[in-house]
Amino acid sequence: MADEKMNEGGVVEEAAGALERLLPEHPVLAGLFEQFTDVEWRRSSEQHTAVVPKDRLRDFSLAALQAGFEMLVDLTAVDYLRLRRVRFEVVVGLLSLQHNVRLRLRVPVPADDPNVPSLVPVYPAANFFERETFDMFGIVFGDHPDLTRILLPEDWVGHPLRKDFATGAVPVQFKSSPQVT
């Protein structure tokens, strides 16, 4: 938290010098950088990160695939409740085996519109990752072929990895389990 500061609204912001915001040195990343001028590029601890607007996610992902990022390694989300202006962030890990480089995509997602385009048409491996992120965070992936819960029962109320999810010692009765007496 040393590289972050609190503004008057109580929102943590990254300090200006915390991350490098330079043209990526790797030629594959530099090509994407030039193609997408609205994407913010960061590099910290040898990790290349692109902050992609959610309406450009599918276009950027398709360009990344064509540039050689053939593997989607991971897709998840982060809930920054009361820490940032934009509450959620979808985080996507891509890998280029042929160029030996990784790229992390961070997609800001506002709480009042938790919708992001699905990456399944570009990376079929995103299927179960998106279902898990929907199940745990409530982020909806538009055009997903089967956006249903994957870990919790269909009748579960809420999304347990949200910071405002109520926790407590209330016994949970699942519809398929025997009654607890």
What kind of region is each of these model predictions?
Residues 1-181:
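Terminal low-complexity/charged segments
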